[in-house]
Amino acid sequence: MPVLSHILGFPRIGLYRELKHALEQYWEKKITENKLLDIGRMLRMRHWKQQINSGINLIPIGDFSWYDHVLDMSIMLNNIPTRFHILSQKKNTLNMLFSIARGDSINNTTITPSEMKKWFNTNYHYIVPEFVQNQIFKLNCTQLLAEIDEALSLNHPIKPVLLGPLTYLWIGKTKETKEFDRLSLLPSLLLVYKEIFNILSKKNIQWIQIDEPALVLELPQTWLKAYLHAYDQLYQTKIKLLLTTYFGKIYHQLPIIKQLKVNGLHIDLTNCSDNDISLLHEQLPKKWILSAGIINGKNIWKTNLYDWFLKLNTITHQRSLWIGSSCSLLHSPIDLNIESKLNNNIKNWFAFAIQKCSEIKLLCDALNSNHNDNSDQQNILKKYYNTNIQRLNSNIINNPQVQERCKNIITLDHSRKTKHITRMKLQHNRFNLPLYPTTTIGSFPQTSEIRKLRLKFKNKQINEDYYYTHIQQYIKKIIQEQEKLDLDILVHGEPERNDMVEYFGENLKGFVSSQHGWIQSYGSRCIKPPIIIGDISRPIPITIPWINYAQSLTNKPVKGILTGPITIMTWSFAREDIPRHMIALQLALAIRDEVMDLEKSGIGVIQIDEPALREGLPLKKSEQSYYLKWAINTFKITVSSVKDNTQIHTHMCYSEFNEIIDDILKLDVDVISIESSRSDLQLLQFIKTAGKKLNEIGPGIYDIHSIHQPSINEIMDKLKKLLQYIPKDRLWINPDCGLKTRSWNEIRESLNNMVIAAKTLRINNGLNN
């Protein structure tokens, strides 16, 4: 049987982010719903044809999404959060989907959006399903069936994609005060899946890809037993199931997996050994398809196809084999061929989504032709990777000075020498901070004019003087706005930054940036990760001129905002030829240099953002302690040499911090702000446990991603809850994230209400403002 090619999913956003632009135009009522639907159909058809032209035998259907594939699954199961039922008579399915994701209002009553959470260990965000006890699911698969009919018109084999029932339950949350077992909902859920399977079998669908990435985790035994029960129930002879796992190894689950009633297994093999492949081949039922996920869907480096040919060649004679991407190519940019500004030698090291499809075909061709003793295809594979082998000795990637500096610093103790209680007194005296200090996270609204200005400067259409003058004008406006609001710690607003990671990537050696390497983060939000190609250093100061200019405009402290080493690494396409902890160490030394220069220039408040610290945590608990040890040490390297009266802040995304409270405490930052406003109950649990242990904390007091403007009373209610667990001299008041995606009108009202709430609290404590 020939080796078949497939992928688990394809990017949705379009080559030039057409989906992003269409969504935002629709939300702003600039295009009609029909126009939006037309753009969606156009993108799907284009993407399917791109896959077919690249040699993919089975194209995935159902991987397209208007906002998020997990939310799509909730809609398909008619799992609409109770608070949105009031909209059911006024909203069609598409608009209900947007309301759940973004929030809404009716009769002047705010309906809060569902929580947004990171998709396993990626920078993609999904909308968290919400469950209530005794919930009944009902099928609503109109969108999926429409897409299947569109795809069938191409007369090419297709493979519908569904999120599996156990993973769907695992990643969701109960919405009732009293916890209940989510597995109690499985019987109702399985009835809907059976209904979907029956409908698809009538359309003569042969294969369904059913995604169960939760299997890479170390699951409780009750959940593993539920897998056996679920796939017994779902088994039918009319349709075949490819059980799909990704984002890690699943060997610890093989005793359960090999008992499941499925027809094939897809495994992420990007971090496997030869022994792993042999183990899989030996243990899995011989009648199963083994789908080898050998093309890394989360990174942009070429694959050593010849090496994989040698590993897989013997298996092709013994079992049915498919070759695919490790995970969905959702996490990869679309097409390397439209990158016109990358150095050709460097560009030749990379593969984006379309090129990854071609890689899969190349390997399949070689494995299939090998049956005829044809060595031509093998030679093609060898030549394909030659440039990446030569890269390892290139001066572009190797910097002996950086490597030597890393050796010298790695064994030192990087703890701050003075306890926080002493530092806090020095810092509050230096800045004359009131009780409940107010601040923001860093960025302020980025208008189209700012973006155009940056683009013109990047394309050398304006000179440096013109650019600097106009950026300074924006900074001046941002400082003035904050002073009008009477915030306590100001920021310069980051008008010079396109993205918190890409900006530093553009200013550090060891990085390159693409023009069109966009990937989806959530909804219409796209990011363009920089690419780490070599050893990292900071040739000149990066932020000093902007921060110092901002500080010259005000007597209030201005925070220097830097992105931390773990986040820069995690949100970049990282090199794969050295360990991740070494990449992070190089970044820490570069950021440390920037921290010290900020302090020398007179900046006394410095924020090192690490929203990705928790995201980088390995999915398996048994592997987490090693990561946390080096990740915490990496952060400490960036700040260990600052003076006691320099206040160090960090900003993080809340995500199950309860599991790593002790490690968060080891950071020993002076102030931690947390993006958490959509997770109020979980945040309160964290605060209950850690509130009195943490130094100072600024829980995100409102959700900047929602269109809802918080009232003074809403903010006051939240603050009163928080003050039950946080000492009043340790509570800071701030939004939950940067403000760059909001408009000035939106943020003025929200920040004004936030400041009034802080002042009211001070008055209630018998203090002056």
UniProtKB/Swiss-Prot annotation:
Keyword ATP-binding belongs to the record:
no
Domain of life the protein comes from: Bacteria
- A GO molecular-function descriptor: 5-methyltetrahydropteroyltriglutamate-homocysteine S-methyltransferase activity
State where Zn(2+) binds: H651, C653, E675, C737
Keyword tags = Amino-acid biosynthesis, Metal-binding, Methionine biosynthesis, Methyltransferase, Repeat, Transferase, Zinc
The cofactor remark states: Binds 1 zinc ion per subunit.
Q: In which pathway does it act?
A: Amino-acid biosynthesis; L-methionine biosynthesis via de novo pathway; L-methionine from L-homocysteine (MetE route): step 1/1
Cofactor(s), by name = Zn(2+)
Q: What EC numbers are recorded for this enzyme? A: 2.1.1.14
Q: Where does 5-methyltetrahydropteroyltri-L-glutamate bind?
A: R17, E18, L19, K20, K118, R525, C526, W571, E615
Q: Which residues bind L-homocysteine?
A: I441, G442, S443, E494, D609
SUPFAM superfamilies, A to Z: UROD/MetE-like (SSF51726)
One matching Pfam family: Meth_synt_2
Residues at the active site: H705
Reaction catalysed by this chain?
Answer: 5-methyltetrahydropteroyltri-L-glutamate + L-homocysteine = tetrahydropteroyltri-L-glutamate + L-methionine
- Could you say which residues bind L-methionine here? I441, G442, S443, E494, D609
Q: Which family does it belong to?
A: Belongs to the vitamin-B12 independent methionine synthase family.
In UniProt terms, what function does this protein have? Answer: Catalyzes the transfer of a methyl group from 5-methyltetrahydrofolate to homocysteine resulting in methionine formation.
Q: What is this protein called?
A: 5-methyltetrahydropteroyltriglutamate--homocysteine methyltransferase
